[in-house]
């Protein structure tokens, strides 16, 4: 069985939660719980409420995601 590709979509940070997790409102209006990817964490990139980000979502569970990029 081949692994399903993840869905990439843009969103805006609504709220910062403990353990480097965030509530993100996606372009389609869905609100997901997202954590920070390792590369962003490694380079100490700050993510604040109101920032525009790119989120990867698994097709198996669309309520959780991973933040992969913060737009400038």
From Swiss-Prot:
Q: Which UniProt keywords apply?
A: Cytoplasm, Initiation factor, Protein biosynthesis, RNA-binding, rRNA-binding
Encoded by which gene?
infA
Gene Ontology molecular-function annotations: ribosome binding; rRNA binding; translation initiation factor activity
Query: Which terms in the GO cellular component ontology are assigned?
Result: cytosol
Q: What is this protein called?
A: Translation initiation factor IF-1
Instruction: Give all residue intervals belonging to the S1-like domain.
Output: 1-72
Matches recorded under PROSITE patterns: S1_IF1_TYPE
Give the matching Pfam families.
eIF-1a
The UniProt family comment states: Belongs to the IF-1 family.
The entry describes its oligomerization and partners as: Component of the 30S ribosomal translation pre-initiation complex which assembles on the 30S ribosome in the order IF-2 and IF-3, IF-1 and N-formylmethionyl-tRNA(fMet); mRNA recruitment can occur at any time during PIC assembly.
Where it sits in the cell: the answer is: Cytoplasm
The record's CDD domains line, in alphabetical order, gives:
S1_IF1 (cd04451)
Q: Per its database record, what is this protein's job?
A: One of the essential components for the initiation of protein synthesis. Stabilizes the binding of IF-2 and IF-3 on the 30S subunit to which N-formylmethionyl-tRNA(fMet) subsequently binds. Helps modulate mRNA selection, yielding the 30S pre-initiation complex (PIC). Upon addition of the 50S ribosomal subunit IF-1, IF-2 and IF-3 are released leaving the mature 70S translation initiation complex.
Database matches in NCBIfam families: infA
Name the InterPro entries on file.
NA-bd_OB-fold (IPR012340), RNA-binding_domain_S1_IF1 (IPR006196), S1_domain (IPR003029), TIF_IF1 (IPR004368)
Checking SUPFAM superfamilies in the record gives: Nucleic acid-binding proteins
